[in-house]
Amino acid sequence: MPMSDAETLEGARARAAAAARTAAPPYLAIGLEGGLSSEPLETLTSWAAATDGVRWGYGSGGRIVLPDAIAREVRGGRELGDVIDEAAGHAIRGTRGAWGLLTIDLVGRRDAFITATIAALAPFYNPTLYR
């Protein structure tokens, strides 16, 4: 799991680049990545990267502070998915995700990436301002 904003953004960029390599033009490839950031607080964050092969757009979603016990486990080397599955008592990593667990499903895993994706696409749907 990425352990900083820079690592999380790089993961999103790598996923978008990989998607772009499999697409036929014209395309718009998007990569999503979740990770941890410890500045100024230990938070779960989401980044999105988008490319059309020439231009790039980036966006970050909301953040949520991780409970100390979960943050400690992840910083100690455990996968966040394993930790949240254990905390929930069953597998939720691919459905509710950490966001769903932490917010009692007010915000879900999918929701966490919506703002990031919309922000990453801004240079494509609003090109006049992003010249």
Where would I find each of the regions flagged by the language model?
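Anionic-ligand binding patches
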Residues: P2-R131
